[in-house]
Regions:
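Hydrophobic alpha-helical transmembrane segments of multi-pass integral membrane proteins
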Residues: 168-187
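Short hydrophobic/aromatic, small-residue-rich stretches within specific transmembrane helices
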Residues: 49-53, 173, 177, 201-206
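Transmembrane alpha-helices of multi-pass small-molecule transport proteins
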Residues: 48-63
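Membrane-interface alpha-helices at helix entry/exit sites of multi-pass transporters
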Residues: 40-51, 71-74, 163-174
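Transmembrane helix boundary and interhelical junction motifs in multipass membrane proteins
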Residues: 23-31, 147-157
Length: 264
């Protein structure tokens, strides 16, 4: 029974990795959904999801950066601001009754905006540095609070602001998620004093997301055009939003306090 459950979870996270990696995402929110449905304890869910996020975002970073659409000039100030903010946000506790609804509303709004046809073309504009830094801090802090890599917030924002094209958005999101996920997991290791992931459980899942992430990142980096990436990203965000609302009242093995301590 245990082996069968792990197999089902592995198949589910493989699908999530394939879907999310198409747009340069690591699939952290999707992995959390799968683990929540599988009734994995919260203290195991977040570090496991972050580890899987690191695996997938490593693949998507390699695939999308190789397309030549990576914006280093925009990426560096974003991560310089987001990483320390994500560390700080990871130690902030919020009421569990507010956690999923807040994220669900944010993702739903972003998805709807992405389905609205754009008026312009693939032209982009150069943002002011202080605005980039402020957005990096906000996204990092928000990601730290809710426990994700931040791509679900970064992608629609920089695309809708006209800072990046669809391809550039995917190439930016992948390494952004990678560094923030590493920061989050590192923070957990420091906080707990040991490696917080059960490798006997996580390794089969990691192998599954390698397959899914490679498939999705290959398709996304080479096959899909501008509107295709916008559509897929919108679908991904809708799925993540629906997941937040559907699982609002399903908290497996709840912790003693009525708060969610996130891990960035």
């Amino acid at each position: 029974m245990i082996e069968a459950n792990i197999l089902l979870i592995a198949v589910a996270v493989l699908v999530m990795a394939a879907l999310y990696s198409t747009v340069g995402h690591g699939g952290g929110s999707g992995d959390l959904a799968v683990l929540a449905i599988a009734a994995i304890a919260p203290e195991e869910m977040r570090p496991t999801a972050l580890l899987l996020n690191i695996v997938v975002s490593s693949i998507t970073t390699w695939k999308f950066v190789a397309t030549g659409t990576f914006r280093k000039d925009l990426f560096l100030p974003l991560v310089c601001a987001s990483i320390p903010a994500a560390f700080f946000g990871g130690y902030v506790e919020i009421p569990s009754v507010l956690y999923k609804p807040i994220v669900g509303v944010v993702l739903l709004f972003a998805a709807i905006r992405l389905f609205v046809p754009t008026r312009g073309t693939e032209k982009t504009k150069q943002p002011l540095l202080y605005i980039v830094l402020c957005i990096g801090v906000v996204i990092g802090f928000l990601s730290g609070i809710i426990g994700v890599g931040g791509g679900i917030f970064l992608s629609p924002l920089i695309l809708l602001l006209g800072w990046t094209t669809a391809k550039q958005t995917a190439a930016m999101s992948a390494p952004f998620i990678l560094v923030n996920s590493v920061a989050g997991l590192s923070g957990m290791i420091v906080d707990r004093g040991d490696f917080p992931v059960d490798l006997s459980f996580a390794m089969p899942l990691a192998l599954a997301v390698v397959v899914g992430g490679t498939i999705g990142a290959t398709i996304g980096s080479k096959k899909l055009g501008h509107q295709g990436l916008r559509t897929v990203l919108g679908v991904v965000l809708l799925i993540a939003s629906a997941k937040m609302f559907i699982t609002m009242n399903s908290t497996p093995n709840p912790p003693q306090s009525d708060t969610v301590k996130s891990t960035s």
